[in-house]
């Protein structure tokens, strides 16, 4: 029994019909998904927070963000962005270097100016002004305007300078209101009663009221454009600025009579009184520099204005008031000397650059015309008369300063000279003998002025001559000159000192005065 049991344990029994197959493990089955570290609620909160942050950043940096600053015009930025070329100072590469001991010829002392120095594009590039488009469209038959891409500039500083100039003119005109030859009233009366222009049926025109106004023109929106000009290389530059003058009392009132000379002279007389006031003026002012020799046949010759006559009279008022019999035509002589100088410069072939200014045709000039016609039965503010006067004023203005007509003014010589050197009235000489400049003696309106001259013969005028006559700041010299018994020169335009004149500087010891 024991032997059979052990044999059965050692040898297992398998039925013949049963087969054992090996177990195969399939490794391609998907693994169970990993559990997320955040729950659905936490993910929703994180997503909403990120969206809020993106919206806040967009609002802060794109909507409420500051605009980028404009490109600086400082020296450091210019040096890095716009490098300058010093071709004039650089040595020439195609010619041998000149020795220091070599004496150059007279024609080679002044270094040549590049031909592109007056070119419009070269000037705009060197001044960092963008006024020319990249691809301009051609236009034939008339000058082409290149609209400026530069930002319009404010003219606040220019308004202040113009206001000071106009205020000085108004004050000078008021100071000279009683002068028989130098006042604006005399100039206007002479202009209105010119026998060559006044019709025969109009009697003598009498100016009854003049108002130079109290307000000042306001300039704004200045821009520089390039204009094609066949007479200049690369065209020419033109400055456009808007000007506006309103709410001012600029007016002129006159009285005259209409004469009926048929069938006999002065058969009937009709009194007429007119008052013209400028209500508002606005337009676009064009300013450009015109070379004289190239545009002499295209530009208009400057016409003398009352301001020119007044300025000439201011310069010569001392000589006119002291000796009217000796020099009755002082302003005319001064104007003749100026014209002779201009003719001399043109004869010598010296190019003289002029300033040309005009207004565009889209200007606005509003006038107020008041009229009174008749002696007994008077007609007041006749509409037809106002229409005729406005049309005449508009025609006068357009014939002079509206495109294509321009006013040409020659630029003065601003080269510093000792004959034109002065001292402000608020300053005094620190020492008695420190001044080497010859200062003229300013006299009272009843005597002639001594002309100071550095050889040129031009008389020097005092600073701020419109404030208190002509002796502001020079009273010490005048009185000391009178105390020394100096003899004043009666020929103020000769430029030299005549007689035994004695001058003393302020602060010096007085000389011995001989009593007679």
Curated annotation (Swiss-Prot):
Any single GO BP term: phospholipid transport
Domain (SMP-LTD) ranges: 151-412
Domain of life: Eukaryota
Lumenal side: 1-43
Cellular component GO terms held in the UniProt record: endoplasmic reticulum membrane; ERMES complex
One Gene Ontology term of the molecular function aspect: lipid binding
Membrane topology: Single-pass type I membrane protein
Membrane-spanning ranges: 44-64
CDD domains: SMP_Mmm1
Cytoplasmic compartment segments: 65-516
Entry keyword set: Endoplasmic reticulum, Lipid transport, Lipid-binding, Membrane, Transmembrane, Transmembrane helix, Transport
Cell compartments where the protein resides: Endoplasmic reticulum membrane
HAMAP family: Mmm1
Subunit structure as annotated in this protein's UniProt entry: Homodimer. Component of the ER-mitochondria encounter structure (ERMES) or MDM complex, composed of MMM1, MDM10, MDM12 and MDM34. A MMM1 homodimer associates with one molecule of MDM12 on each side in a pairwise head-to-tail manner, and the SMP-LTD domains of MMM1 and MDM12 generate a continuous hydrophobic tunnel for phospholipid trafficking.
Family classification: Belongs to the MMM1 family.
Protein known as: Maintenance of mitochondrial morphology protein 1
